[in-house]
Amino acid sequence: EQQRYLNAKKYVKLFLVADYIMYLKYGRNLTAVRTRMYDIDNVITPIYHRMNIHVALVGLEIWSNTDKIIVQSSADVTLDLFAKWRATDLLSRKSHDNAQLLTGINFNGPTAGLGYLGGICNTMYSAGIVQDHSKIHDLVAIAIAHEMGHNLGMDHDKDTCTCGTRPCIMAGALSCEASFLFSDCSQKDHQEFLIKNMPQCILKKPLKTDVVSPAVCGNYFVEVGEECDCGPPRTCRDPCCDAATCKLRQGAQCAEGLCCDQCRFKGAGTECRAAKDECDMADVCTGRSTECTDRFQRNGQPCKNNNGYCYNGKCPIMADQCIALFGPGATVSQDACFQFNREGNHYGYCRKEQNTKIACEPQDVKCGRLYCFPNSPENKNPCNIYYSPNDEDKGMVLPGTKCADGKACSNGQCVDVNTPY
């Protein structure tokens, strides 16, 4: 499964924000600020393409009236404020994986940017901030690529790290020389981070219509108006795609995709993806497109020796959720612990309505907070929960989890598996 995850194409749906000082700096000219940000995006895209990651700009916001947070010269404080604003405001308006704030302010000391290490796909921490510190947009783009690198699990390079001659992207200090490569250490950091955390949001390919930047033929991503995109003409080796026009060559039906073979659609019924487990199904081609549509077993089908029920292609059971939260020795707590879910507080509730925690009904207690026994030398408490004020939903019993024979959790209630949920 790890190898399958590593080999999969990754997509970072990026949202860029420019603050009020940026707007003033570029003469209150929205077009100038937008152009600056598009130019930056066009530098970031090929940098990450080498890492098997496509960066798609899915949103752009310019604070042309007033800042939506207090942008200040303390980078730490500004990053925290920006991340909170993203989590509470931006995410509810526009779905994206990562947000970066470009500011015209001077940060204290030599800092040109800051980003949370390993924050990608996290509601609170998938964010960075960068100072518009140079007239040369390449250098600012590299600073954003650097902060995104932190979000993707990369630490600063040590002296022994190498990417060729220049300092690499994750160098600890700013360079006035542009470097477009990640070091061997960064690539190792990133791979280890992916294996350990397997962030899911970056597996989802954005739609052509999600991308807000002008279409660029040669950036490896098929955008509105393009039929294919195999990169710049000098490097494209795709016999199906005309790299100069991003159109299919004469006679070609397709250029890429799991249901495309030698520029033709694969036949209807051809298997394009094997079943991953008992809740998945083998996926097949239609013969009419390159898409390999993901199919899975119906919700409610028993799985894992009748310990769970299939839900959206997975088999969520409490035992696995306790191990994920507390480590390999953890087990599910005794039934008595789940009675805390009837209290309707931080430690026990079934769902939230307008941010109010709703206590569980007696029959629903196993669809609220998950109670686990860590079974470790330092923790012998039989009733443990995982609670983080920054991500209150983490540590709740997952939707679709078996809560009784013939029943599964749906929206904090223990419902019959034969009803749609």
UniProtKB/Swiss-Prot annotation:
The active site is at E147. CDD domains: ZnMc_adamalysin_II_like. Disulfide bonds join C121-C201, C161-C185, C163-C168, C217-C246, C228-C241, C230-C236, C240-C263, C254-C260, C259-C285, C272-C292, C279-C310, C303-C315, C322-C372, C337-C383, C350-C360, C367-C409, C403-C414. Keywords: Apoptosis, Calcium, Cell adhesion impairing toxin, Disulfide bond, Fibrinogenolytic toxin, Glycoprotein, Hemorrhagic toxin, Hemostasis impairing toxin, Hydrolase, Metal-binding, Metalloprotease, Protease, Secreted, Toxin, Zinc. GO terms for biological process: apoptotic process; proteolysis. InterPro entries: ADAM_Cys-rich (IPR006586), Disintegrin_CS (IPR018358), Disintegrin_dom (IPR001762), Disintegrin_dom_sf (IPR036436), MetalloPept_cat_dom_sf (IPR024079), Peptidase_M12B (IPR001590), Reprolysin_adamalysin (IPR034027). Its cofactor is Zn(2+). Its EC number is 3.4.24.-. A motif (D/ECD-tripeptide) lies at residues 278-280. GO terms for cellular component: extracellular region; plasma membrane. Residues 214-299 form the Disintegrin domain. Glycans are attached at N29. Residues 10-206 form the Peptidase M12B domain. GO terms for molecular function: metal ion binding; metalloendopeptidase activity; toxin activity. Binds 1 zinc ion per subunit. Snake venom zinc metalloprotease that induces apoptosis in vascular endothelial cells (VEC), without degrading the extracellular matrix (it cannot cleave collagen) or inhibiting adhesion of VEC. Has also fibrinogenolytic and hemorrhagic activities. Belongs to the venom metalloproteinase (M12B) family. P-III subfamily. P-IIIc sub-subfamily. This is Zinc metalloproteinase-disintegrin-like crotastatin. It comes from Crotalus durissus terrificus (South American rattlesnake).
